[in-house]
Amino acid sequence: MPELEQIRCEREQILMDADSSLDHVFFPDSGVVSAVAVYADGSIIEMATIGREGCTAVQAVFGAKISSVRLLVQIPGGAAKMSRAAFMRAIGSMPSFRTLIYAYLQALLEQILVSVACNGAHNLKQRLARWLLMMRDRSDDDTLQITQSLLGEMLGV
């Protein structure tokens, strides 16, 4: 797609903040991005994990123009960046792209539902194991370079 710009994402970089204009969609091709909720006291907790299987800011499909989450780079890597307008044009004019995005939306919803169930039913050690596996699946690297502080925030501890 000609409207994609390749960018480098650095660890703990904020690609988009909550309550900011939803101007771009990011397609990680390496590395991992988390969609996190930001609370009034500044604390955060992870709601979704995005790697090469998907894209950020899919709420644009439903007409959203303001981001409801912070997009935080967990594992550095590359990504393709596309404007929200170009993303919406592609969804409208490319049936195969639209089908892929809808399939990803379904997978993302499943991921969020499993995460909610896991957070309610499992202890911290089990949640950590799930989180590490999700990071490994999306990064193709056995070494995860992440701080204990950020890991604690992602797990809500």
How does the language model describe each region?
Residues I7, F26, A48, L72, ...:
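Residues that recognize and position ribonucleotide moieties
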Residues Q13-P76:
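Cyclic nucleotide-binding regulatory domains
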Residues A48-Q106, E110, V114:
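Cyclic-nucleotide recognition modules
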Residues I75-P76, I91-V157:
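Polybasic "coupling" helices that flank or enter modular domains
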